[in-house]
Curated annotation (Swiss-Prot):
The lineage of its organism: Bacteria, Pseudomonadati, Thermodesulfobacteriota, Desulfovibrionia, Desulfovibrionales. PANTHER family: TRIFUNCTIONAL PURINE BIOSYNTHETIC PROTEIN ADENOSINE-3 (PTHR10520:SF12), TRIFUNCTIONAL PURINE BIOSYNTHETIC PROTEIN ADENOSINE-3-RELATED (PTHR10520). Gene3D superfamilies: PurM-like C-terminal domain, PurM-like, N-terminal domain. The gene is purM. It catalyses: 2-formamido-N(1)-(5-O-phospho-beta-D-ribosyl)acetamidine + ATP = 5-amino-1-(5-phospho-beta-D-ribosyl)imidazole + ADP + phosphate + H(+). GO terms for biological process: 'de novo' IMP biosynthetic process; adenine biosynthetic process. GO terms for molecular function: ATP binding; phosphoribosylamine-glycine ligase activity; phosphoribosylformylglycinamidine cyclo-ligase activity. GO terms for cellular component: cytosol. This is Phosphoribosylformylglycinamidine cyclo-ligase. Its EC number is 6.3.3.1. The keyword Aminoacyl-tRNA synthetase does not apply. InterPro entries: PurM-like_C_dom, PurM-like_C_sf, PurM-like_N, PurM-like_N_sf, PurM_cligase. Keywords: ATP-binding, Cytoplasm, Ligase, Nucleotide-binding, Purine biosynthesis. CDD domains: PurM.
């Protein structure tokens, strides 16, 4: 009877054997993400994680979920699937870092119409690499084969991250005040936002993936699939020595929509546009898309993937720590008093 049901399910478009083959493929590198606290192996009904609270007086769990968006389309176009998993981890982990949380574990959801074991293995390998960079465990996941739901050969991803922070050390921006300094940390490139506009511009220009980006040594293929940078090591090290008042992950909505999310109503962030190095891909997108820089900063990170807001007297120490970690960082602005009618982000060109 079980063989009949299995064949019927296969005829309906769901291959259980392919799912089992995937589990076999990924077990070794998923296990490499294990950290202290992991109690379960891959393949169970749930992932088990034991919290170590010896250094946390009032533990607060912080969670986030996200995807990779239409950046996946370039993975399909270029048939390269081993880096978008890093993007998936980065989008979730970077969000919980904003509140001072240390990532603990990650879960993924992979959905496709017909499971391609090799392709899915590459994706989950990337997720494992992202988890290792973030120093969190890949505790489990779901692979959903959904016949007819997706274009053949394509898939979608979702990620879920949980971290921990002591309640007394939550970073929420409430202490930000006039005179504080804004530091920008370099992005690795476009990261994972704005790709619908990127695709539109790319298609209009009919460029080839192996063309060199003007002003760069990199090809479009290399830059378009360069993984989102994971900031956990940097932030977890900085927090030990620096009083950080607020942090911002520059994602969809760019500077204008993300920075206000951590600012008190009485202040504005004055950003000096000329204060950091803008990677060549953004100049190319701005020119070919006939976009103003205001529009660019509303959509893209334009070279700044993460923002720190710190007291003025901590700036030298913070910049020295960042330099010792070989992190590209710039003082990009300051916190000022909000006047009537002011937007909360002012870009000074």
């Amino acid at each position: 009877m079980s063989l009949i049901r299995s064949q019927a399910y296969t005829n309906a478009g769901v291959n259980i054997n392919a799912g089992n083959a995937l589990i076999s493929n990924i077990k070794s590198f998923v296990s490499e993400t294990n950290i202290q606290g992991v109690l379960s192996d891959l393949g169970g009904f749930g992932g088990l994680f034991k919290l170590n609270l010896t250094q946390v007086d009032n533990p607060v769990l912080v969670s986030s979920t996200d995807g990779v968006g239409t950046k996946l389309k370039f993975a399909f176009d270029f048939n390269k699937h081993d880096t978008v998993g890093i993007d998936l981890v980065a989008m979730c982990v970077n969000d919980i870092l904003v509140q001072g949380a240390r990532p603990l574990f990650f879960l993924d959801y992979f959905a496709t119409s017909k499971l391609d074991v090799d392709k899915a293995t590459q994706v989950i390998y990337g997720i494992s690499e992202g988890c290792k960079q973030a120093r969190c465990a890949l505790l489990g996941g779901e692979t959903a084969e959904l016949p007819g739901m997706y274009t053949e050969g394509e898939y979608d991803l979702a990620g879920f991250c949980v971290g921990i922070v002591d309640q007394s050390k939550i970073i929420d921006g409430s202490s930000i005040k006039v005179g504080d300094t804004i530091i920008g940390l370099a992005s690795s490139g476009i990261h994972s936002n704005g790709y619908s506009l990127v695709r539109q511009i790319i298609n209009q220009c009919a460029i080839e993936p192996d063309n060199i980006i003007p002003g760069s040594r990199d090809t479009f293929k290399q830059v378009l699939l360069k993984p989102t940078f994971i900031y956990s090591d940097i932030i977890c090290n900085l927090i030990k020595d620096i009083s950080i008042k607020g942090m911002v992950h520059i994602t969809g909505g760019g500077f204008y929509d993300n920075i206000p999310r951590v600012l008190p109503q009485s202040v504005v962030a004055n950003i000096q546009f000329s204060s950091w190095d803008i990677p060549p891909i953004f100049y190319w997108l701005q020119e070919q898309g006939s976009l103003s820089w205001s529009e660019m900063l509303q959509v893209f990170n334009c070279g700044i993937g993460y923002v720190l807001i710190i007291p003025n007297d901590s700036v030298t120490r913070a910049m020295n720590i960042l330099k010792s970690m070989e992190v590209s960082a710039w003082i990009i602005g300051s916190i000022e008093k909000q006047n009537v009618g002011d937007e909360q982000v002012i870009i000074t060109y």
